[in-house]
């Protein structure tokens, strides 16, 4: 139902890191927000010459962490490139509401499937085959939109309350 592709890294990566204005956003796990689901900025950029060795992502793409803290989904709010610690999940058939899919991929039910499929590895890693073998419940697109909007509103309220706690 979706296209799943692994990120990649030009090597050695230090040769490709740049501060140049034409640099491409280099999405790292540390760029993912602690609260929220949208990646809107990166700390580092890579040179355009590294593009052939990585995976380009665009606003509206969904990415999923696939190693160490695996199974955390995020929605891209910017153009960028992902390394091999991420999987790109692109809805090429318009079967999913993006917010719904992002929330669904981060549920305990999905994490349990990821753990089951990754069992036996020294380090739990996901790959596109493992993620592609997961089972998802798929309500109508209209129902997905309602659920996705509802869950995003709850996330927004939680973030606002947490900010107030730390003021």
Regions found by a protein language model. Give the residues of each.
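A short beta-sheet element
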Residues: 28-30, 37-108
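Short beta-strand/loop turn elements enriched in aromatics
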Residues: 18-35
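Amphipathic alpha-helical segments
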Residues: 101, 135-167
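Short coil/turn segments at secondary-structure boundaries
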Residues: 11-18, 117
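Short acidic/His/Gly/Ser-rich catalytic and metal-binding motifs that mark active-site loops
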Residues: 35-39, 124-126
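Non-catalytic DNA-recognition/assembly elements of restriction-modification systems
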Residues: 1-10, 35, 133
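Specificity-determining recognition surfaces
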Residues: 104-136
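Short amphipathic alpha-helical segments
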Residues: 85-87, 130-134, 154
């Amino acid at each position: 139902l979706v296209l799943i592709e692994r990120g990649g890294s030009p090597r050695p990566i230090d040769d490709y890191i740049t501060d140049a204005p034409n640099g491409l956003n280099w999405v790292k796990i540390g760029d993912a927000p602690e609260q929220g689901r949208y990646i809107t900025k990166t700390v580092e950029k890579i040179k355009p010459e590294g593009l052939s060795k990585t995976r380009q992502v665009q606003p509206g793409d969904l990415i999923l962490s696939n190693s160490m803290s695996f199974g955390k989904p995020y929605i891209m709010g910017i153009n960028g490139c992902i390394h091999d610690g991420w999987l790109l999940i692109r809805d090429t058939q318009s079967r999913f509401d993006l917010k719904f899919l992002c929330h669904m991929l981060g549920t305990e039910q999905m994490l349990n499937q990821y753990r089951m499929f990754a069992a036996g590895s020294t380090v739990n890693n996901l790959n596109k085959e493992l993620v592609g073998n997961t089972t998802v419940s798929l309500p109508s697109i209209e129902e997905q939109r309602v659920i996705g909007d509802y869950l995003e509103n709850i996330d927004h309220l939680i973030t606002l309350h947490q900010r107030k706690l730390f003021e």
